[in-house]
Amino acid sequence: MRLLSDQKFETIHAFEVVDDDKMVSWLRTAVTKPGAPGYDTNRYFLWCTFSVLAPYRRRGIGRSHLPVLLELMDRDGCHTLTLESEEEPGHAFLGWLGAAKKSEGAENRLHIPEVDWAMIRRWIDEGEKGSPETKLEVYDDHIPDALLEEFAPQFSALLNTMPWDDLDHGEIVATPEVLRHEYERMDLAGLKHHTVLTREPNGVISGMTDITWAPHRPKILSQLFTGVRPDARGRGIGKWLKAYMLDRMHRLYPDAEWISTGNADSNGPMLAINKRMGFKRHRWGAEYQISRDKLAERVEALV
């Protein structure tokens, strides 16, 4: 079964393997659409994720997805396939495939009832005192539309400071149109979006963090992105942002018990902040990449 979701800036394909009306495997792919922001540097990358139910593994279902992936890569002119796994069978499959492990990371979770609130308040005070001319801005909704022209390029710059490890990748380009589309999707899902950022006297956004809360899982807050400009690091801005956001979310969502966030294992500064706050590893994973030609060799060997 094949499902197609034609998003505004990406082409999404979803495939399902069904046994007696029961979905036993799924495959999802994404590729940047021609004309989308960042297309020139992202056009050659196809991203995918798939899974097979445990009782149906080792029957060739995972291998059956490979010709589909090759067909999609050829159709869109992609030369690199990016995959991921959070389970040992998945890592073993990707090793068999010949994909190279390029980045490792984890979902880390903070149990809010165990937070050291005295430390959190101290970090907030230290942030204010350490950067007295830096303004903290709080948005308990999306960034206002009137600010997107100014916000989008600075947000893009922050996003592109994320550690990529050995992953081949394009440039992240967040335009006002891209952000509006993302906000529309959040609204359709019923998400509540919150952003805290720091702005320097010259108007430059030196750091930011944002979080979503979902009514269908009210106990868990999802921290999406936290970043500080390289030229603003060493001033405690990351701790200030994380502490302020945590304190605010605890007040707005007193019944929430967890904050979940994802971090690359190589992101030492952010992991150090998270560890002091009480974040603990919940689920480990890795990203892999394989070239189109190497995938084709594996597909030919299956015939």
Where in the sequence are the language-model features?
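Conserved catalytic-core motifs of GNAT/GCN5-like acyltransferases
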Residues: P34, E84-S85, A100-E114, K275-D293
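Conserved acetyl-CoA-binding loop-helix of GNAT-fold acetyltransferases
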Residues: V52, R58-D74, A92, W96, ...
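Conserved N-terminal glycine/acidic-rich loop preference
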Residues: G207-T209, S222, R235, W240-K242, ...
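Conserved GNAT acetyl-CoA-binding A-motif
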Residues: M73-E86, M249-G262
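Hydrophobic alpha-helical core bundles mediating ligand binding, dimerization, or RNAP-core interactions
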Residues: L148, A152-F155, E182-Y183, K242
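Conserved N-terminal entry element of GNAT/NAT acetyltransferase domains
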Residues: V115-E149, W164-D166, A296-V303
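A conserved beta-strand-loop-helix scaffold within acyl/acetyltransferase catalytic domains
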Residues: M1-F15, D19-D20, S25-Y39, L159-I220, ...
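Long, hydrophobic/aromatic-enriched structural stretches that serve as scaffold segments
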Residues: R28-T80
